[in-house]
Amino acid sequence: LEIQAIADDITSKYVPPHVNIFYCLGGITLTSFLVQVATGSAMTFYYRPTVTEAFASVQYLMTEVNFGWLIRSIHRWSASMMVLMMILHVFRVYLTGGFKKPRELTWVTGVILGVLTVSFGVTGYSLPWDQIGYWAVKIVTGVPEAIPVIGSPLVELLRGSVSVGQSTLTRFYSLHTFILPLLTAVFMPMHFLMIRKQGIPGPL
């Protein structure tokens, strides 16, 4: 392996003079995601994804586990930071024309990552299975009901049954801890490699 050549390529990449702090928003979003991976992994040691034990396990994490309150708080703060930085990043890219040719596919992968980020928020919000989480899930999963023909089957697919319950929590837990992180781990490198290949767009 030509490790030195790879290291030189990474460390000697030309940075255009117009690049400022606003071009770091995507990197901050990535950092927030990595913090959530670390803290989320720690919380899985204590969280129990059942409707009878989920809330109690979160309470146990917050009150009994050493630094459990800090781990969960950092997870929540970094989640909010990730959403905020992603929104600002989208505005910066749009205002600087970073979505235009030849960077259309970079924009597409970014939009997919945006959808995944929102999905993280929706699924994670339900996991404590408190009153707020329960009713949020009920409302969100009920939205597709308005779609003609496929609305009802889609709602049942999201919930795992006709009503919100254990099947719903299991689905959301699986999405939040396995499927969404896996998809993000696929699209993030694609997004960064495209940026690396095509470079940073010019100034306004």
UniProtKB/Swiss-Prot annotation:
GO cellular component: chloroplast thylakoid membrane
The UniProt record lists the keyword Hydrolase: no
Binding residues annotated for heme b 2, in chain numbering: 75, 176
Keyword check for Iron: yes
Keywords for this protein: Chloroplast, Electron transport, Heme, Iron, Membrane, Metal-binding, Photosynthesis, Plastid, Thylakoid, Transmembrane, Transmembrane helix, Transport
Gene Ontology BP terms: photosynthesis; respiratory electron transport chain
UniProt-annotated binding residues for heme c: 24
GO molecular function per UniProt: electron transfer activity; metal ion binding; oxidoreductase activity
Gene3D superfamilies, per the entry: Cytochrome Bc1 Complex, Chain C (1.20.810.10)
PROSITE patterns: CYTB_NTER (PS51002)
Transmembrane segments: 23-43, 81-101, 107-127, 136-157, 177-197
Subcellular location field: Plastid, Chloroplast thylakoid membrane
UniProt similarity note: Belongs to the cytochrome b family. PetB subfamily.
Miscellaneous notes: Heme 1 (or BH or b566) is high-potential and absorbs at about 566 nm, and heme 2 (or BL or b562) is low-potential and absorbs at about 562 nm.
Protein name: Cytochrome b6
Species: Picea abies (Norway spruce)
Gene name for this UniProt entry: petB
